[in-house]
């Protein structure tokens, strides 16, 4: 089988014959060369295969560097874009600012009237002009007296508000419009009483105006814009409806009945007064010592009147007005100012009373401004103030539904012309409370709902009302007993007579309230110290001693007779006062200095 194998002799013979025909190269060398070539290719491929991971790493590193570079360039590009955008916006803003600064100035005017051809009348630069309106402005929204902005061509380009500054003028009369559908007009007077006619701005024309109102006026445009509150009167007048009731006042039943007859009956039963041809009183004078309830009564009258009017008319909102005049503040160093304030106060009262609402004008400390004419030491301002009040009370202009109530500690100093019948008709003396009156006043401040000490409650079987009544009884007995402890003063009259005055002679509702307040404060301190809550009788008795001790220095005056008159002691002139206080830390018999001619500062 040798002849079947490749490369055998038969093949060799064929090869020799073929080679002999044209090929002289050795076939084995060619194969060897091809084998070497293939081996080199394999080695090259092996080297490439070996070098491939390293190249991949290099390429990956270059790719990462390229990506980072791209990110940096992108971020820088974004910053440049943002910077360019900001620069562009700044350039635009600067261009707008330059354009705005380069614009000609705009003028302002006051709108007067509008017309169908899209033109309006305005008042600008002291002239009345008819100008066009920009399409961006709604001509129907313009109101008389409103400010408008004009461009360089005098075209209305913007609507403003209403003027808020100007002169304050007094309204004399509201006039009819100058033309049909035109602006309302008013006659006003300036600070020099110079009268002029002005237009009323639309917001003001919609309000109800009365003669005497203060108006804000632009004299150049000729418009009145708003009603100005009368601050000078508001400072002097407390316009309110008090919440004090007659039930809150103790010990003054007779006086309350008198003032109700004088004030409430004419308002509530005007038909009966007309039937009997009885004229209601114009004024009431409440006089008496300090702290006895004069102001409280006046407030209670206003509150009661409001309730009575509401019940009579069926209107829940019906009310009365209480004009509380701060007497000494009426005085003004400028001549005629005090009289003008009085006129304005009564004008305000007439305005409030014009619709049937009761108005009470209350003058506290009446002697300070309406004292007897000719009694002034440094000046005689009362010579004009008193006649002004008299003319307001019973002058040509009547006071309908207005009643004047005056309160004073020194009624002897008030001008007699004010006190005569027909002016302050009713004079009610508010006296110091007696023992029964003091009990009634105590009952207003000591009520069963207060904390009461357990020992005091146990004494009356836990009955709180009985305990309170007993506490009040003990306290009043201690205050009003004629004992050495209650002696206050020894006064010597001009005729040589002497009289001992007790603390009860100077008691008042204000003093009783102060005693109760002291006792309540002592009860609070007792709770903090002993942890035993409740008010006791001893607290009230100690409060009486403390109150009397504090009042020991009060009569120290260089004119004892004047002090006695203010305190309610009338009669023989007092020339000498000696204290008789024997309370704690007090020495009996201290003499009050009654020196005279001590100078104006005393």
Curated annotation (Swiss-Prot):
SMART domains named in the record: AAA
Gene3D superfamilies: 1.10.8.60, 1.20.5.170, Nucleic acid-binding proteins, P-loop containing nucleotide triphosphate hydrolases
Gene Ontology biological-process annotations: modification-dependent protein catabolic process; proteasomal protein catabolic process
Coiled coil: 28-103
Keywords: ATP-binding, Chaperone, Coiled coil, Nucleotide-binding, Proteasome
Associated pathway: Protein degradation; proteasomal Pup-dependent pathway
Amino acid composition bias (Polar residues), ranges on this chain: 23-32
InterPro entries: AAA+_ATPase, AAA_ATPase_domain, ATPase_AAA_core, ATPase_AAA_CS, NA-bd_OB-fold, P-loop_NTPase, Prot_ATP_ID_OB_2nd, Prot_ATP_ID_OB_N
Top-rank taxon, per record: Bacteria
Segments of skewed composition (Basic and acidic residues): 1-13
Disordered as annotated region, ranges: 1-33
Gene Ontology molecular function, alphabetical: ATP binding; ATP hydrolysis activity
One cellular component term from this protein's GO annotations in UniProt: proteasome complex
PANTHER family cross-referenced by the UniProt entry: AAA-FAMILY ATPASE, PROTEASOME-ASSOCIATED ATPASE
Job description of the protein: ATPase which is responsible for recognizing, binding, unfolding and translocation of pupylated proteins into the bacterial 20S proteasome core particle. May be essential for opening the gate of the 20S proteasome via an interaction with its C-terminus, thereby allowing substrate entry and access to the site of proteolysis. Thus, the C-termini of the proteasomal ATPase may function like a 'key in a lock' to induce gate opening and therefore regulate proteolysis.
Subunit structure: Homohexamer. Assembles into a hexameric ring structure that caps the 20S proteasome core. Strongly interacts with the prokaryotic ubiquitin-like protein Pup through a hydrophobic interface; the interacting region of ARC lies in its N-terminal coiled-coil domain. There is one Pup binding site per ARC hexamer ring. Upon ATP-binding, the C-terminus of ARC interacts with the alpha-rings of the proteasome core, possibly by binding to the intersubunit pockets.
Domain notes: Consists of three main regions, an N-terminal coiled-coil domain that binds to protein Pup and functions as a docking station, an interdomain involved in ARC hexamerization, and a C-terminal ATPase domain of the AAA type.
NCBIfam families in UniProt: pup_AAA (TIGR03689)
Record's protein name: Proteasome-associated ATPase
Species, as recorded: Saccharomonospora viridis (strain ATCC 15386 / DSM 43017 / JCM 3036 / CCUG 5913 / NBRC 12207 / NCIMB 9602 / P101)
């Amino acid at each position: 089988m040798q002849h079947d194998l490749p490369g055998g002799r038969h093949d060799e013979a064929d090869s020799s014959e073929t080679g002999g025909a044209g090929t002289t190269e050795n076939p084995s060398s060619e194969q060897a060369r091809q084998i070497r070539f293939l081996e080199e290719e394999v080695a090259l491929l092996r080297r490439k295969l070996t070098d491939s991971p390293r190249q991949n790493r290099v390429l990956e590193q270059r790719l990462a560097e390229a990506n980072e570079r791209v990110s940096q360039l992108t971020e820088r590009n974004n910053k440049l874009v943002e910077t360019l955008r900001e620069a562009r916006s700044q350039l635009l803003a600067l261009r707008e600012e330059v354009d705005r600064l380069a614009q000609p100035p705009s003028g302002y005017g006051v709108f007067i009237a509008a017309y169908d051809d899209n033109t309006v009348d305005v008042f600008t630069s002291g002239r009345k002009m008819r100008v066009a309106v920009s399409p961006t402005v709604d001509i129907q929204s313009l109101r008389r007296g409103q400010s408008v902005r004009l461009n360089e061509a005098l075209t209305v380009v913007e609507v403003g508000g209403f003027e808020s500054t100007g002169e304050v003028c007094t309204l004399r009369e509201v006039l009819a419009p100058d033309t049909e559908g035109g602006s309302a007009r008013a006659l006003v007077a300036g600070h020099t009483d110079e009268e002029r006619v002005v237009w009323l701005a639309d917001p003001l024309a919609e309000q109800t105006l009365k003669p005497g109102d203060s108006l804000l006026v632009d004299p150049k445009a000729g418009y009145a814009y708003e009603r100005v509150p009368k601050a000078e009167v508001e400072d002097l007048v407390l316009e309110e409806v008090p919440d004090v009731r007659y039930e809150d006042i103790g010990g003054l039943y007779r006086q309350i009945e008198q003032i109700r007859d004088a004030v409430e009956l004419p308002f509530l039963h005007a038909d009966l007064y007309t039937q009997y041809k009885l004229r209601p009183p114009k004024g009431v004078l409440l006089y008496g010592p300090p702290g006895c309830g004069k102001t409280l009564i006046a407030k209670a009258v206003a509150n009661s009147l409001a309730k009575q009017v509401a019940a009579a008319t069926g209107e829940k909102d019906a009310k009365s007005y209480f004009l509380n005049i701060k007497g000494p503040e009426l005085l003004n160093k400028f001549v005629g100012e005090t009289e003008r304030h009085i006129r304005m106060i009564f004008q305000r009262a007439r305005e409030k009373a014009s619709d049937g609402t009761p108005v009470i004008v209350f003058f506290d400390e009446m002697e300070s401004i309406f004292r007897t004419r000719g009694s002034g030491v440094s000046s005689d301002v009362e010579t004009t103030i008193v006649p002004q009040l008299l003319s307001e009370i019973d002058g040509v202009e009547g006071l309908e539904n207005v009643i004047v109530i005056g309160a004073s500690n020194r009624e002897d100093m008030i001008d007699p012309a004010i006190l005569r019948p027909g002016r302050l008709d009713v004079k009610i003396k508010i006296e110091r409370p007696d023992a029964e009156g003091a009990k009634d006043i105590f009952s207003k401040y000591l009520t069963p709902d207060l904390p009461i000490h357990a020992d005091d409650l146990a004494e009356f079987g836990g009955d709180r009302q009985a305990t309170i009544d007993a506490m009040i009884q003990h306290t009043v007995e201690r205050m009003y007993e004629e004992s050495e402890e209650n002696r206050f003063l020894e006064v010597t009259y001009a005729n040589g007579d002497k009289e001992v005055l007790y603390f009860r002679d100077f008691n008042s509702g204000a003093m009783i309230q102060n005693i109760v307040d002291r006792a309540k404060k002592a009860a609070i301190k007792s709770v903090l110290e002993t942890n035993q809550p409740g008010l006791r009788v001893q607290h009230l008795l100690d409060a009486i001693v403390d109150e009397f001790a504090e009042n020991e220095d009060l009569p120290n005056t260089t004119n004892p007779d004047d002090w006695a008159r203010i305190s309610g002691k009338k009669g023989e002139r007092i020339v000498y006062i000696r204290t008789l206080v024997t309370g704690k830390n007090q020495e009996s018999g201290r003499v009050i200095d009654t020196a005279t001619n001590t100078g104006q500062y005393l």
